[in-house]
Amino acid sequence: MVYVKTNNYIRKIDELGRIVIPKEVRHKLKIQENENIMITSDDSKILISKYSYLENYYNYIKSIAEYINEIYKYGIEITDRNKKIISISPSNYFIETEIIMNSIEIGKIKIYIDNNDENQKFLKLISRIISSYFDYS
């Protein structure tokens, strides 16, 4: 029989409805200060999970990656802060940049092309297109 070790924490809710998430849990889940989390309820349970803007807009992200691959024939990989969202035709040589929203890194883009000024500008453009989508959604 396999036993899974679970950590149970008892916390009080303050007058504003806030709950402190223990440092150990935040560290284990790699939750950083000012990072968004998603709270859902299921019967008598409250579930807290990390929120990924990129994962929740997978179809939009996928279409951008497919267009870049189809038009430019570039391999592309888009990740949130923890996992790969989409990867098309990766190769050995790539350049990458962060996807920034409200001064917070929400992900990274890798494009599998040579590193030069024009390609860096193209990569930053794609990053801004993706992050600007969240400003208006």
Predicted segments, located by residue:
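Short regulatory alpha-helical segment in sensory/regulatory domains of signaling proteins that mediates
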Residues: 65-72
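Short hydrophobic beta-strand segments that form the core of ligand-binding sensory/regulatory domains
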Residues: 46-50, 98-99, 105-114
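A short beta-strand signature within small-molecule sensing/ligand-binding domains used
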Residues: 91-100
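Short hydrophobic alpha-helical segments used for membrane anchoring or interfacial signaling
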Residues: 39-41, 75-83
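Amphipathic coiled-coil signal-relay and dimerization helices
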Residues: 47-49, 83-90
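Juxtadomain coupling helices with adjacent low-complexity linkers
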Residues: 61-65, 106-108, 112-137
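Short, structured interface segments
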Residues: 32-53
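Short beta-strand-centered segments at strand-helix junctions
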Residues: 16-29
